A protein has these predicted regions:
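Helix-biased "structured C-terminal domain" signature
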Residues: 1-381
Length: 381
């Protein structure tokens, strides 16, 4: 297991060496280190793709400079793949597509609420059911990351995000990361939808975290005088998931308060991911170089509300200690474990669309799980 907490077959340095020749094809014009924009010191990088069809700036973080760079470039790479798809598609209603094989139930997927998914003619593409290995039709809108307009026929039914999009040096890495992400986004959305009392009941004492990865990150925040609040947002799926809030301890409206979230079979890794993402979110906000920030987020009144809400959350007392949960020992075992937990929570159907391109040779997938909430609308997707 790497310092970043995930099962990796190669080092970040090897990953960078592998993808560097691909940068021109991906449209990446530069990679920037943004760590020094903030006081925390957790490495954060950005990869820039000016002609992207989704977002033009991709962030990455890690325990080292190389890990942060690799994270940013791999995020750019997976988005490029999801933008440039050339699959076989069918335009059909949910009732029509099942004549051609198994299909996901559109009613159980994240909807815009603007169109009836039961009667709308949707674009469908084939994926694989990870539980059965059989082909399954998935709405193409939940696979594509081409956000350009006008949208194709059959779009507008689902919330189009990058949720479940993942890549890795091996296919198992990509699939596992995609599964973790959809579980994480579901957990965070459910926490935000809960009552204030229910949210507060999930508070975790940062001092009780005993894992090496999370302790190192917590020390960086503490040394910089940045307050951290943690919530255990694990759902009935029982895969450890955490939400972290980083905000200025004195409450002065300086750097925006930012959330980070993480999920993993190992609770320490899940918490470390949440903390690292909170650090990344701070740097991203400081840099201003993220093209999916909503315009209203820069409004002074909105910023004041965010600071007030963050301070209120920070002052609520933790109610539980960190609970260590260990991984299964390998990526393959962790994936089997995750699929069993999903099935036990009523989400047995886990679709995996393979977006890999032979000329790149890097596994890229999109995971779609009916029954899970999509990305919380208050966060970048």
């Amino acid at each position: 297991m790497s310092a970043a907490g995930a099962h990796r077959g190669v080092t970040p340095e090897q990953t960078l060496a592998r993808v560097r020749p691909l940068l021109p094809r991906l449209g990446i014009t530069r990679i920037a280190m943004l760590t020094g924009l903030d006081v925390v010191g957790i490495p954060v990088a950005a990869a820039y793709r000016p002609n992207s069809r989704s977002i033009a700036v991709h962030q990455g973080k890690g325990a080292t400079l190389a890990a942060a760079k690799a994270s940013a470039v791999m995020e750019a790479l997976e988005c490029w793949h999801a933008e440039m798809l050339e699959p076989v598609l069918r335009l059909a209603t949910a009732g029509e597509i099942v004549r051609h094989g198994d299909a996901l139930d559109p009613v159980r997927l994240p909807l815009t609420g603007q169109v009836d998914p039961g009667t709308a003619r949707l674009l469908w593409t084939e994926a694989a059911d990870l539980g059965t290995g059989r082909p399954v039709w998935v709405p193409f809108e939940l696979v594509s990351a081409d956000f350009t307009v006008p949208a194709p026929a059959g779009f507008g039914v689902f919330r189009q995000t990058t949720n479940g999009l993942a890549c890795g040096n091996a296919r198992i890495e990509a699939v596992l990361q995609g599964v973790y992400e959809v579980v994480e986004r579901n957990a965070v959305a459910r926490w935000h939808a809960a009552t204030p009392d229910a949210q507060a009941a999930r508070g975790v004492d940062p001092a009780s975290a005993d894992g090496a990865a999370s302790r190192w990150l917590l020390a960086r925040f503490a040394g910089a005088g940045v307050a951290i609040r943690i919530w255990d947002v694990t759902t009935d799926i029982e895969l450890p998931a955490f939400l972290a809030l980083a905000c200025d301890a004195d409450g002065v409206a300086g750097v925006e308060p930012e959330f980070g979230a993480g999920c993993h079979a190992d609770a320490d890794v899940a918490l470390a991911r949440a903390l690292a993402e909170a650090a990344q979110a701070r740097v991203t906000r400081i840099s201003g170089a993220r093209d999916d920030f909503p315009q209203h987020s820069f409004d002074p009144a909105m910023r004041a509300d965010r600071h007030a809400a963050a301070q209120s959350l920070r002052r609520s007392a933790p109610t539980r200690p960190f609970r260590a949960v260990r991984s299964q020992g390998s990526a393959e075992a962790d994936l089997d474990h995750a699929l069993r937990l999903l099935a036990g929570a009523g989400c047995a159907q886990v679709a995996c669309a393979d977006l890999s391109r032979p000329e790149f040779g890097i596994p890229v997938v999109r995971i779609v799980v009916p029954g899970l909430e999509g990305a919380w609308e208050g966060a970048a997707a």
